[in-house]
């Protein structure tokens, strides 16, 4: 799925490059539109993340949402903040996807959050590193995502885009909601997996947990 999606995104980007760049690019005219489109993308993708029960789909929509923040940064002229968020996002999103892989590994391939629950007792390292990733992407102080998102939102406000700022702030709240919904459904509450899956539950090997810990530290 990832290879197909990446291929489509690249093809689209290259086609748009070839069609639009020869005609010129007026920053003064286009920048506000880019900011609005970025804010709308961030918000819409966050609402889609709330509706998902597949752990990988939740993270996929969260990626689209965070890309929306980066477009907001470009639209309001906060290029450094956009690159900063790109870097922080690289670490906590790698952490979250690897953590999701560890969960799926423990669950013998199951990806449905509604069939999980109570996993913190069986995969504690994965649990705590996923909590760190959720805090980082939610923009909770003092984790990495707070500083990069705060810079983007402040730039939107100070450059005279209050609506973009408000949508970005609302999106941050939605992000926190669906990420901790993911953590809650997977790791907390009652166990909802079948007996056979429960019998094989185990923490991932060091080849997976060590990178999780390193990425968690880089997300602080």
Show the residue positions of the predicted features:
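Hydrophobic transmembrane alpha-helices and their helix-loop junctions in integral membrane proteins
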Residues: 1-207, 211, 215-219
């Amino acid at each position: 799925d990832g290879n197909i999606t990446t291929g489509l995104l690249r093809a689209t980007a290259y086609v748009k490059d070839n069609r639009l760049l020869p005609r010129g690019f007026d920053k003064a005219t286009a920048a506000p539109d880019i900011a609005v489109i970025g804010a709308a993308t961030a918000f819409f993708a966050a609402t889609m993340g709330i509706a998902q029960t597949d752990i990988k789909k939740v993270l996929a929509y969260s990626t689209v949402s965070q890309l929306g923040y980066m477009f907001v940064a470009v639209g309001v002229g906060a290029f450094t903040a956009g690159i900063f968020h790109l870097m922080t996002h690289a670490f906590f999103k790698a952490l979250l996807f690897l953590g999701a892989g560890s969960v799926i590994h423990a669950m013998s391939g199951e990806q449905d959050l509604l069939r999980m629950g109570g996993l913190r007792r069986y995969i504690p390292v994965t649990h705590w590193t996923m909590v760190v990733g959720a805090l980082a992407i939610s923009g909770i102080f003092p984790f990495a995502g707070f500083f990069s998102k705060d810079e983007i939102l402040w730039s939107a406000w100070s450059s005279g885009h209050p609506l973009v700022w408000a949508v970005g702030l609302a999106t941050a709240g939605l992000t926190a909601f669906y990420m901790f919904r993911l953590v809650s459904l997977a790791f907390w509450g009652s166990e909802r997996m079948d007996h056979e899956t429960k019998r094989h539950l185990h923490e991932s090997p060091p080849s997976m947990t060590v990178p999780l810990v390193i990425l968690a530290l880089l997300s602080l």
